[in-house]
Amino acid sequence: MEEDRGIADPPLDSLLSRSGSKYGLVIYAAKRARQIDQYYIDLHEGSFYAHVGPLVSVDADDKSLTVAMREIAEDKLDLKSSAAE
């Protein structure tokens, strides 16, 4: 039996501990989600990949924002370096 997931998986509280603010977390996750979307567009078109694909395992029905948040939760991304940009 599959474990029930909440509305936000991973929980937002655990993600906030990795970011200095809610605003920073939202901006960073949204940027990463757009990169993931663009990766799949490039993959479909057969063009050169300008973006890195998902760094975590992905199910077919996962949205790019969910994938981005899971990457943050699993420490696959460094939020500190993006704050300087």
From Swiss-Prot:
Name under which the protein is recorded: DNA-directed RNA polymerase subunit omega
One of the Pfam families matching this protein, by short name: RNA_pol_Rpb6
Enzyme class: transferase
Assembly information from the UniProt record: The RNAP catalytic core consists of 2 alpha, 1 beta, 1 beta' and 1 omega subunit. When a sigma factor is associated with the core the holoenzyme is formed, which can initiate transcription.
UniProt keyword S-adenosyl-L-methionine present: no
Protein's job: Promotes RNA polymerase assembly. Latches the N- and C-terminal regions of the beta' subunit thereby facilitating its interaction with the beta and alpha subunits.
Reaction(s) this enzyme catalyzes, per UniProt: RNA(n) + a ribonucleoside 5'-triphosphate = RNA(n+1) + diphosphate
Alphabetic keyword roster: DNA-directed RNA polymerase, Nucleotidyltransferase, Transcription, Transferase
GO biological process per UniProt: DNA-templated transcription
Membrane-crossing segments per the record: none
Recorded name of the encoding gene: rpoZ
